[in-house]
């Protein structure tokens, strides 16, 4: 019996030693990551510190401060790194690093979309189906884009602003956060589904306000699924959900809403199967829908089950299409809407800057100024894109008020790699953020100031411009950067041009605008901005 007790004691001691080594000595001393500076003393042993920082919505500022103290590569967890230098960013984001399970929260209808696809080959195959219709050259030359933009701007947006300054109503404040979220949704939804099958959020204030509440609930509920997925699944099985039921209901309603948009296209879907797309007005062309559906069908016919896309996409094309387009409409709305809100806020602080911008806009031929004796016209997209002041104020807003300022996680490859001077094993979560990159003082002197002049051609030499552009990361970089960046820039420039060719804006209530949320997405604290519009005579 004594021998048995001795054996049990030895086993217990060995187990204790193994645990101490595995979770204390190895991560702090022998792990390849042990050479990397720690953001906080506990990070080699536990994720608790970084989990709390994220839960408290302090990640961006906390990690930016850590990089300023410790350098460009910082350890923030037992198996997690944060990076803030261009060489490391190139290694990770241009090196084909996969996405971690963190992105699974962006799956829709149980199916990964292009954004949430973890493996590079699957992402690349999907990207090839639609990259052409999101290219700058396609967008600028598309008759459908021009026709859709004309209707959204002249038929929906500008009439709302005109009504806000009408004598019958008297000058009053307009919540432009809501207006911009509506306009950007209409732009992206109509580009995807066509004007006739897209949204009209600008014309339906009640529903868009309801939609924004649903979307807020969705965004506020992703923490546990992203950071503690296994615990979250276990708690659901035990009937102890970590996410509130109202968030699940909001997600369900949003999913049903997008499914309804796709269902309206079913007749078109069938006609595509027959290779006979229905005729219609130019503005009714469903550009992204056509490219995605036809591309998936061709891949299914040509490759079938052997395709890298078969398990998640080709095996159920309808679910795959709905998942992809759900991601496009939500991301396309929010990011551009946030930038427009912050840009109009910055412009409204300087009437003189608005006058300069208007002079530049009215020099376009044709321009977007409304006149009683002429039909509203759309500017030449290429000429609009080249306007230096318009480009400068937009770029500076994207820099200082990036709509996605938070970390963009990747995973080191199975065989490990080198990140700067350090060796990293496989499976390490690693990320950069626009928040930190956009505050590099070498590229952006006085980075906390909104200074649009830094982007003007006359204010920098070629090397300074190249440096600034290399550090600009509002759309990420590499093969998995934002596919909709060209569309977003095009629509934002059009919307700003339409407004400031005809109106001067003044701040009425900007409470909370200074406090941009500290997380993956950067929203104004109150999610509202009230401006007064004054018609230019």
Segments (PLM) and residue ranges:
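N-terminal membrane-proximal hinge/A-helix region immediately C-terminal to the signal-anchor transmembrane segment
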Residues: 2-125, 150-152, 163, 183, ...
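Cytochrome P450 C-terminal beta-domain/meander region
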Residues: 68, 72-74, 379-396, 407-431, ...
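Cytochrome P450 I-helix active-site segment
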Residues: 209-214, 348-403, 425-426, 451, ...
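Cytochrome P450 heme-binding "Cys pocket" and the immediately downstream C-terminal segment
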Residues: 197-198, 351-354, 461, 467-468, ...
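Conserved cytochrome P450 K-helix/beta-meander segment immediately N-terminal to the heme-binding cysteine loop
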Residues: 432-462
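Cytochrome P450 heme-thiolate monooxygenase catalytic core
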Residues: 100-107, 142-340
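Hydrophobic, well-ordered secondary-structure elements that form the walls
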Residues: 397, 427, 450, 478, ...
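Short, small-residue alpha-helix embedded
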Residues: 335-348, 495
